[in-house]
UniProtKB/Swiss-Prot annotation:
GO terms for cellular component: cytoplasm. Mg(2+) binds at residues 13, 40. SMART domains: Adenylsucc_synt. GO terms for biological process: 'de novo' AMP biosynthetic process; IMP metabolic process. Plays an important role in the de novo pathway of purine nucleotide biosynthesis. Catalyzes the first committed step in the biosynthesis of AMP from IMP. Keywords: Cytoplasm, GTP-binding, Ligase, Magnesium, Metal-binding, Nucleotide-binding, Purine biosynthesis. Pathway: Purine metabolism; AMP biosynthesis via de novo pathway; AMP from IMP: step 1/2. This is Adenylosuccinate synthetase. InterPro entries: Adenylosuccin_syn_GTP-bd, Adenylosuccin_syn_Lys_AS, Adenylosuccinate_synth_dom1, Adenylosuccinate_synth_dom2, Adenylosuccinate_synth_dom3, Adenylosuccinate_synthetase, P-loop_NTPase. Transmembrane segments: none annotated. It comes from Nitratidesulfovibrio vulgaris (strain DP4). Its cofactor is Mg(2+). It is an enzyme of class 6 (ligase). IMP binds at residues 13-16, 38-41, 131, 145, 226, 241, 305. The gene is purA.
Length: 426
């Protein structure tokens, strides 16, 4: 039995979907422990591409149980739409293999309206690039202890009272500050209950389900969303998400003790990308950046937005290692670098006249660093057909080993293409 946490080591979009899908074969239960539908996993199975926003990608494997933990914020409308889409493609979506924690907080219609109104109201320089899906406002209500939880769907009177109480404040903001029309409590209640009727059969005690699985000797895979440097506490604040994305939250967001987590795999893309606003020291606003974007198909699975691209930032990776304590690294999209004559790695920053090995902690400090690069030979070889470590060209192996040396963490998986079988185990 092995319990594995998979988390992103950069700004999200590291290729977690493929690695989770690969590791699912070796797991019995897959748990999503934070975030909402602001993140998307793209999984390629044969000729079929699946994009999952809420439901763990383990659902694509027969016989696997998928759980959505208390650390997630769930949009009932999106959840129901995702269920219908997967079911139409022949995937078993029965409550016996997909469960939602009763403690999971729900994204309400007014959360989405507030998220979009607030971002539109900000001046250009203050925008943080939110997806506008209500994630932040939902986490706000959770922290303020006025949120709606999944279990409330089975208690209509409690749900209605929570909606009415929330709209007293939300409507004051809509009409008084943002110039929006007020929302009607009855309309919101009816909309939520319409989706809630489909959602209630999936409610369960997720913590208990995980502990029962362990008692039976089964393995659990904890699937993180987004990336370390979008973490609400440890990311490039304020250009971050609203939840903790680091590995430690796998326990809190699922209802299990951290001592049960055996292995932590950090997913690292072979170059760096970022969606939306925020500092990005190694960003390439040139032909090389365009090359990476086009060859790597760097467009958001959730928003379709172009991802900003740049060289691998080892300063960011060192911080990720310090925060997450990974046992090993899965290196993804190495094949995208094929065709580049030279490849650079940022090994340090210059900040306030000094060379530093870790990101500055002041707000927007990373917007004022200068990357220090080392350059390595590139390669022209197409490596997508390589199936063993020995078959990789020498410059490719040198690049992988250099990343391993800088981070101090073994790279156990090397992805050389989007398919499941285009992965080399070391």
């Amino acid at each position: 039995m092995s319990n594995v946490v998979v988390m992103g080591a950069q700004w999200g979009d590291e290729g977690k979907g493929k690695i989770v899908d690969l590791l699912t074969r070796e797991s019995d239960v897959i748990v999503r422990f934070q975030g909402g539908n602001n993140a998307g996993h793209t999984v390629l199975v044969g000729e079929k591409q699946y994009i999952l926003h809420l439901i763990p990608s383990g659902i694509l494997h027969e016989g696997k149980k998928c759980l959505i933990g208390n650390g997630v914020v769930l949009d009932p409308e999106v959840f129901c739409r995702e269920i219908d889409s997967l079911r139409a493609q022949g995937v078993d979506m029965s409550p016996a293999r997909l469960m939602i924690s009763r403690k999971t907080h729900l994204i309400m219609p007014y959360h989405k309206v507030l998220d979009q109104a607030r971002e539109a109201h900000k001046c250009k320089d203050a925008k943080i690039g939110t997806t506008g899906r209500g994630i932040g406002p939902c986490y706000e209500d959770k922290s303020a202890r006025i949120g709606v939880r999944a279990a409330d769907l089975a208690m209509p009177e409690l749900l209605r009272s929570k909606i009415e109480a929330a709209l007293v404040e939300k409507n004051a903001l809509f009409t008084g500050l943002y110039g929006q029309q007020p929302l009607d409590a009855d309309a919101v209640f009816e909309e939520v209950m319409a989706h809630g009727a489909k959602l209630v059969p999936y409610l369960a005690d997720v913590s208990s389900e995980i502990h029962d699985a362990w008692a039976e000797g089964r393995s659990v895979l904890f699937e993180g969303a987004q990336g370390t440097h979008l973490d609400i506490d440890h990311g490039t604040y304020p250009f971050v998400t609203s939840s903790n994305t680091v590995s430690g939250n796998a326990a809190a967001g699922s209802g299990v003790p951290p001592t049960k987590l055996d292995r932590i795999i950090a997913i690292v893309k072979a170059y760096t990308t970022r969606v939306g606003a925020g500092p990005f020291p190694t960003e390439l606003d040139d032909a090389t950046g365009e090359y990476l974007q086009q060859k790597g198909h760097e467009f958001g699975a959730t928003t379709g937005r172009k991802r900003r691209c740049g060289w691998l930032d080892a300063v960011v990776l060192r911080e990720s290692v310090r925060l997450n304590g990974p046992t090993d690294i899965a290196l993804t999209k190495l094949d995208v670098l094929s065709g580049l004559k030279e490849i650079s790695i940022c090994t340090a920053y210059t900040y306030r006249g000094e060379q530093v090995a870790y990101p500055p902690q002041e707000q927007n400090g990373m917007a004022h660093v200068t990357p220090v690069y080392e350059t390595m030979p590139g390669w022209d070889d197409d490596i997508t057909g390589c199936t063993t470590w020995e078959s990789l060209p020498a410059p490719v192996k040198a690049y992988v080993l250099r990343i391993e040396e800088i981070t101090g963490v073994r790279i156990s998986l090397v992805s050389v293409g989007p398919e499941r079988d285009q992965t080399i185990r070391r």
